[in-house]
């Protein structure tokens, strides 16, 4: 079964526009901002299924990043980053699940940037970066790296391989407000039309990893990445709640308040194996902005995959005004 979504506003405020622009019979009553769209995302966006998989959750393969963007409408990507003594920042899941469509962080960024610059009117993308700090076993050598050094290297490569003028940073959103959180709750996110062709980077880490990053960039001043910060903190702007069924009410409240929220439509193979879209439907109903999946397109022999509504990569969400009416057709 393919799930298609049509968002129908309860109050006629906007037309639903694709990436070519917003249209409708009525004039806009409020400018569209970054948190007024929903986008399809992929989990472990670089992933290639291993030849011999030790577990069901590794049994999926993604198209290359630019193909996901061009053909599947994916606008949110997740990249795991490891430090390697030979190759610097490498991209793979773990040592038992190392297949990847872009072997290094640089290659991943360059692949997405090339597509972005060739399609410079696309809705803004989000790139979630998860640093991995487990020791790597290679050639009988155990390599470790200080977490702060890993974060600095990630920040450095973002600055080197992605143009600053095509990046939406915490400083851009904060503006003249004392904190990022105040800016999000008061002025809101940047306008959608001013954000086309740009990207938001998010550090997918909590605990010590996040705290080390905030030590380097207090209040995220000067930072290139947003963080998953606690509600009420000065850095709070973006949240990841991966269970849209159990966390649906919290997701909906965060969305209503003006935060950007990521969730997941499937995890570990249970949903695709049972052609179960309940989790996906819950994510849509809660108004989550990015909905991540292992199956953004058709897979031979499987009925389950997550379809973008009407082929539009980022449908307008009405959750900032009222919850959408969701029709599954």
Task: Provide a role label for each language-model segment.
Residues 9, 287, 327:
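Conserved functional loop/turn residues at catalytic and ligand-binding sites
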Residues 323-329:
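Single conserved hydrophobic/aromatic residue that forms the stacking wall/gate
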Residues 22-321:
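Catalytic cores of phosphodiester-bond hydrolases, prominently lipid phosphodiesterases
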Residues 1-22:
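Secretory targeting signatures
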């Amino acid at each position: 079964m393919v799930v298609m979504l049509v968002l129908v506003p309860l109050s006629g405020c906007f037309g639903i526009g694709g990436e070519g622009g917003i249209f409708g019979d009525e004039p806009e009553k409020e400018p569209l901002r970054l948190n007024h769209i929903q986008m399809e995302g992929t989990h472990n966006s670089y992933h290639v299924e291993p030849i011999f998989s030790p577990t069901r959750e590794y049994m999926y393969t993604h198209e290359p990043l630019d193909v996901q963007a061009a053909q599947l409408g994916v606008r949110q990507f997740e990249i795991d980053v490891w430090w390697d003594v030979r190759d610097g920042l490498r991209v793979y899941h773990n040592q038992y699940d190392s297949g990847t469509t872009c072997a290094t962080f640089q290659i991943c960024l360059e692949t997405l940037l090339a597509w972005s610059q060739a399609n410079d009117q696309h809705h803004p993308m989000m790139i979630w970066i998860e640093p991995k700090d487990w020791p790597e076993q290679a050639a009988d050598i155990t390599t470790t790296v200080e977490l702060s050094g890993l974060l600095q290297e990630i920040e450095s490569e973002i600055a080197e391989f992605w143009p600053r003028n095509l990046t939406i940073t915490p400083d851009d959103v904060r503006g003249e407000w004392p904190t990022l959180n105040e800016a999000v709750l008061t002025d809101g996110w940047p306008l959608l039309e001013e954000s086309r062709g740009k990207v938001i980077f998010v550090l997918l880490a909590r605990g010590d990893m996040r705290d080390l990053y905030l030590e380097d960039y207090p209040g995220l001043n000067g930072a290139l990445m947003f963080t998953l910060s606690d509600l009420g903190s000065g850095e709070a702007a973006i949240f990841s709640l991966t269970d849209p069924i159990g966390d649906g009410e919290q997701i909906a409240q965060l969305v209503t308040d003006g935060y950007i929220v990521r969730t997941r439509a499937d995890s570990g193979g249970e949903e695709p194996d049972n052609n179960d879209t309940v989790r996906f439907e819950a994510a849509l109903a809660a108004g989550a902005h990015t909905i991540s999946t292992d199956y953004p397109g058709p897979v031979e022999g499987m009925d389950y995959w997550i379809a973008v509504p009407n082929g539009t990569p980022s449908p307008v969400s009405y959750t900032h005004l009222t919850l959408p009416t969701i029709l599954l057709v």
